[in-house]
Amino acid sequence: MTQKAIYPGTFDPFTNGHLDVLERALNIFQEVVVVIADNSQKQTLFSVEERLSMIREIIEDYPAVSVEVLHDGLLADYARQKGARAIVRGVRQVKDFEYEFQISLLNRHLYPEVTTVFLMPNVKYTYVASSIIKEVAMLGGDVSKFVHPSVLKSLHGKLDESKQHKPNNI
């Protein structure tokens, strides 16, 4: 059994699909570090601090899981620094795999000792993506089956906040 893996992502927000992949990773690895990518090229609904706080609350009952932020740099370098020999990636569809496969080859080139492990979520989460969750929530849909209660509360808070800042169109 490989000791440590990292599970990187934007996690904006962290969904039950992410949690499902994390739990599957814990069946393989003794320790998993959830790594929040602070990617300045991606526009996120939640700040890094908000995502960190939400994930910490979700993983508090998982002693083998920690969460950290990768502000800058390459994921392969980060994995090497942390002594991780595996990168966990959730793959929902073929389209995800094609992209992730290319990234995994690059990571292996940069850090030959690292292996990317692709995990499929439970079938009920195969269509769940953070972007879809945000869109459905913004349109008033119920996303409670797809996110942790604390994420749902934060999501509603963010949406209420954005409604208050929008000018009324008459």
UniProtKB/Swiss-Prot annotation:
Main location per UniProt? Answer: cytoplasm
Which residues are recorded as binding ATP? T10, F11, H18, G90, V91, R92, E100, Y125, T126, Y127, V128, A129, S130, S131
Q: Name one GO biological process term.
A: coenzyme A biosynthetic process
Which reaction is this enzyme known to catalyze? Answer: (R)-4'-phosphopantetheine + ATP + H(+) = 3'-dephospho-CoA + diphosphate
Q: Name one GO molecular function term.
A: pantetheine-phosphate adenylyltransferase activity
Question: Among its keywords, does the record have Nucleotidyltransferase?
Answer: yes
Homology family: Belongs to the bacterial CoaD family.
Subunit comment: Homohexamer.
Protein name listed in UniProt? Phosphopantetheine adenylyltransferase
* Species per Swiss-Prot/TrEMBL record: Chlorobium limicola (strain DSM 245 / NBRC 103803 / 6330)
Please name the gene that encodes this protein: coaD
